[in-house]
């Protein structure tokens, strides 16, 4: 099944399922490792995979090099937007996950 043959709703569902599977795996890893290290590993894995994705869109090394700044700008903007949204979302449920209050 290609993404061209499925609806936007199906793509959204698959997207969310992939996200959940990455988070589930990260949570498993965080049981045995520091969450900070797991987060950094996820960032590195995402950057490595996205470098591969960018390379797949270029027909040759010259095209690849021409696309680098555009790709970097795109992924940085996407990450900033996603991080900002998730930080805001997490603020709403902070006390659910933290049973203590830090001194102000």
Protein language model regions, located:
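Solvent-exposed interaction surfaces and binding hotspots enriched for charged
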Residues: 2-104
């Amino acid at each position: 099944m290609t993404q061209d043959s499925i609806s936007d709703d199906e793509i959204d569902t698959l997207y969310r399922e992939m996200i959940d599977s990455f988070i589930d795996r990260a949570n498993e890893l965080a049981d045995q490792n520091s969450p900070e290290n797991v987060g950094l590993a996820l960032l590195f894995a995402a950057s490595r995979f996205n470098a591969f994705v960018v390379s797949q869109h270029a027909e040759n090394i010259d095209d690849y090099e021409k696309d680098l700044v555009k790709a970097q700008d795109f992924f940085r903007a996407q990450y900033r937007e996603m991080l900002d949204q998730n930080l805001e979302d997490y603020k709403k449920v902070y006390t659910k996950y933290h049973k203590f209050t830090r001194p102000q």
